[in-house]
A protein has these predicted regions:
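NAD(P)+-binding Rossmann beta1-loop-alpha1 motif at the extreme N-terminus of oxidoreductases
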Residues: 1-52, 58-61, 87
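Rossmann-like NAD(P)(H) cofactor-binding subdomain of soluble oxidoreductases
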Residues: 53, 59-144, 160
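Alpha-helix C-terminal capping/helix-to-coil transition sites in glycosyltransferase folds
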Residues: 65-68, 186, 238
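Internal alpha-helical scaffold of NAD(P)-dependent oxidoreductase catalytic cores
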Residues: 80, 91, 120-126, 144-192, ...
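Divalent-cation-assisted or electrostatically stabilized phosphate/pyrophosphate-binding catalytic cores
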Residues: 247-257
């Protein structure tokens, strides 16, 4: 299978390593050709210190790598998802499955990121969301991690599950793409609040109170917006909330501090 990952941030790079480890013909694309050339030479990404990228991973700044791809992973920052989708659109075929791994909601439109991608690629192919408690720093060193592959089309969700699953990266499937994406976006607000708690010197009792009541609120909002209550109690919801609110790797938590 040919897989292409768009975005050389920490998460995009870690994702590309998973796919490469699984034996797929894998390409990692950067919008900056100079950065791509440097990474190809050193086999390292400064955002994932200590991780040596597989020699089999093709690192490039040429969008032509998208031709014939079976799987395309959209991994830019959330603000760049629409622009990245515009760039990928001409290369996609009906057979291609696009995986959105960025988290957030588009400013101005309030669209979920799979919706943004769908608009730009004119829904020519299926879009799946892959989300969960998955800091790139840990996936990069192959720490056991679990995520949820979500799409109303169960076949597409399982295709992504099969592409990513290995002995350190476990993938569950869900038909609730709305809930999975909302959970991944909304927990960031709570992580900021937990950072504020740390900055003010509040301890574990306070943060447990905040996280628990916040998840109840996120669940109610998510249900109103079309998500399933069950989703918010699982990996994509509570799991992601816990890791983002407590981890030393969490940028949102650090920003709150």
């Amino acid at each position: 299978m040919k897989a292409v990952v768009l975005g050389t941030g920490g998460w995009g790079t870690a994702i590309s390593q998973i796919l490469c480890d699984n034996g797929h013909e894998t390409y990692l694309w950067s919008h900056n050709p100079a950065k791509a050339a440097e990474m190809a030479k050193t086999r390292e990404n400064p955002l994932l210190k200590g991780v040596i990228l597989p020699e089999a991973l093709h690192i490039t700044g040429d969008l032509d790598c998208l031709r014939g791809a079976d799987l395309v992973v959209s991994a830019p920052p959330s603000f760049a998802v629409r622009e990245t989708a515009k760039k990928m659109a001409p290369y996609l075929a009906e057979k291609t499955v696009v995986v959105s791994v960025s988290k957030g909601i588009e400013r101005d439109t309030n669209l979920r990121l799979s919706q943004v991608i769908g608009e730009e690629i004119r829904n020519i192919c299926k879009v799946v969301a892959l989300s969960g408690p998955s800091h790139a720093e840990e996936v990069g060193i192959r720490m056991p991690t679990g995520c949820v592959s979500a799409c109303p089309d169960v076949t597409a969700a399982r295709f992504v599950q099969d592409a990513f699953m290995n002995d350190y990266f476990r993938v569950y499937t869900s038909g609730d793409i709305v809930g999975v994406e909302l959970a991944g976006a909304l927990k960031n607000v709570i992580a900021l609040s937990c950072g504020v708690c740390d900055g003010l010197g509040y301890q574990d009792n306070t943060k447990a109170l905040l996280m628990t009541r916040a998840m109840a609120e996120i669940t109610r909002l998510g249900e109103k917006l079309g998500g399933s209550r069950q989703t918010f109690g699982g990996l994509a919801g509570m799991g992601d909330l816990i890791v983002t609110c407590t981890s030393m790797h969490s940028r949102n938590r650090r920003a709150g501090i």
